[in-house]
Amino acid sequence: MQRLSFETTGIPAPVRAVVNSTGPRPGTTRSCVTVAADEEAARGWLLAQPDPAAADKALLTSLASSLGVEVTVETELRFPVGGGFRVQAVGARVLPGSNAENLPLAAARMRGALTGPTKDQAEDWLVMLQAATAGGRKSEAGTAVALELYAGCLMRFPADVAKAACMKLAMTATWFPTLAEINATCEALASSRRLLAHALEQAA
């Protein structure tokens, strides 16, 4: 398969390294420095997006326009006991007619979009969240052990998702959230992208 050029595909410059990271060529290995640079490029691109939904849309548009790979998220309506409704992502699939040769590259690009924040970034967002919420449970993040746990939770999710979750909770939570609440908020924001990544990995 011929490598697509960035000049013709319109792929955002910050994720060029990640898009090409489909694995080392036979007989070669990728250095830790290269991997770190790839992750930093992906992280920077994610954090430059308006929100996780916008990042997901940009990724899907890029996959379709530059690689000929179309993926769709399957959703269902959920009706909470408290009333109202929400749209829940329940699956994803690669559409028929997608360019099979480019599926590994598409999967690599989506893997890059799962890059988590650095520990320093996660801790900075937690400090912001702590400052925005009232006392009570806020003291849970007061010790080094608690901060480590909270930061570790955020680092399991894409960088933009982790930041968006902290921003959302800062605007809606009265008390500093529990670890379970932060995890649940991140899970909801990351569900579509994780399903897309899984579908592409399976297809590739």
PLM features per residue range, with description:
Residues 1-204:
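Charged interaction scaffolds used for protein-protein
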